Amino acid sequence: MTTYREVSAAEYRIQADEKLEAAVRRIAHEQVEQAIAQLRGIDTHNAQGSIHQCRKHIKKLRGLLRMVRPSMGRAYRPANNTFRDAARLLSPYRDAHALLATFDDAIAADPEGVPAGGLGVAWRELVRRADDSTRSVTGGSAEVQRALELLEHGAEGIDGWKLKGSGWNA
């Protein structure tokens, strides 16, 4: 049985018989399509995982762009900025959940260090923010819609990417 990790890693490889420019485009399309699928599939049960996976695909895509940056010329900056902006729109959601998880981990690591009055007010506020964030992204938030638009716009430009040079010099 092939695991997701094995499939994911295989997709991010340049095949021996593939031209570099074609491989870069293929990999970019795969990553952006997977990022879009994660956002389109968001619901209250998978919101945190979907945002995380979407941002991971964007990170891989931007890493790919950085690898070929010298060969992309002026096409690099607008492509990178488009995908960067899409990920940035999703970061407040990630931040709200990461802050709550970090708070919970810190309390679990040292329960004796919790003040006598407790930290219930702070914890409830963090839970409220995380819950509000989940409702926002699953309710068709403007940020998620804009991130989808940016990803789709970025995907449209991939086939126009030209790499200067040849082979590993590209």
Predicted regions span which residues?
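Cationic, histidine-enriched alpha-helical/coil surfaces that engage anionic ligands
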Residues: 2-170
